[in-house]
């Protein structure tokens, strides 16, 4: 399905719907530009207390830190806001982007000597098709489509695309679903790292789990 400019599709993660089937992981591996590697990560939230899983894709930051710290100018952002994997001729394998990403998304693929990450299946979305992961997700944890459809199908939650890290708020192209009665304008990731309340918001818990190792070693 293709969309016009006025009804551009949105990419939404609803982590509370993830059932851990890994269909998204397998589909990502089959994407033609991914060289047989999955660029989506299935995170396990607080393994000691729950079996809950959550998919983690590139959030496609409005001002991508990964691109800003790249000394070789290897990471490009499209006019539609998609942050792409590093360009092979330019990437020098320094891993600056890996260390700089607030969401822990970029990965150095040593066998290719190249940073690779989710590019929202740009070969598909640029021609009006859904990303592979959203196409196969059976529970709707990964959704790609009209913004108004998100509101119609998920009446108890709403999307947010702003995440606070200390004094910095990061705005992203990809959104996460939060409870509709939560009136906060952003998800405070730093607070989740320090508080980590039992049974707390899944979106915060998964980000806390992803970032905790980096914080503990700093």
Predicted features along the sequence, with ranges:
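Non-ligating segments of multi-cofactor redox enzymes
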Residues: 1-218
